């Protein structure tokens, strides 16, 4: 879902 995509994006940037 959208929320999952956003969380994944934030996690990637935080990586």
Curated annotation (Swiss-Prot):
Q: What does the entry state regarding organ or tissue expression?
A: Expressed by the skin glands.
Q: Name one GO cellular component term.
A: extracellular region
Report if keyword Secreted is assigned. Answer: yes
In this chain, where does the modification Leucine amide occur?
A: 15
Query: Where would you find this protein in the cell?
Result: Secreted
Q: What keywords are assigned to this protein? A: Amidation, Amphibian defense peptide, Antibiotic, Antimicrobial, Secreted
Q: What does the record list as GO biological process?
A: defense response to Gram-positive bacterium
Functional description taken from the UniProt entry: Has antibacterial activity against a wide spectrum of Gram-positive bacteria including B.cereus, E.faecalis, L.lactis, L.innocua, M.luteus, S.aureus, S.epidermidis and S.uberis. Lacks antibacterial activity against the Gram-negative bacteria E.cloacae and E.coli.
Q: Report the protein name in the record.
A: Signiferin-2.2
Question: Source taxonomy lineage?
Answer: Eukaryota, Metazoa, Chordata, Craniata, Vertebrata
């Amino acid at each position: 879902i959208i929320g999952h995509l956003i969380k994944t994006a934030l996690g990637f940037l935080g990586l």
